[in-house]
Amino acid sequence: MLYVQHWSFKTVYHKKGTEKFLAGGGDYPGVEMIGRYHAPGSLEGWIVLKTDDPKAIYQHAAEWAEFLNWKTTPVFTDEEAGQIVAKINS
């Protein structure tokens, strides 16, 4: 399943969070990271993930909870969404 995570730094945690990221804390065990994107000039970004184990996403978010706010959304590709809509419309 695909997921999109939106992250944003909590107030005053940018420096500590970036230090953790640069030290390798951005690794995402148990999850295929399709891409991680950073909004220029801001303190937020997005991660596109693929996994059959949402517990791995929960664990990673919990490890970063001191520094980041998270919003995790399961998403479908156009092909997957099309199949669902086709069933509804049949």
Region spans (language model):
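Conserved, structured core segments of small domains
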Residues: 1-90
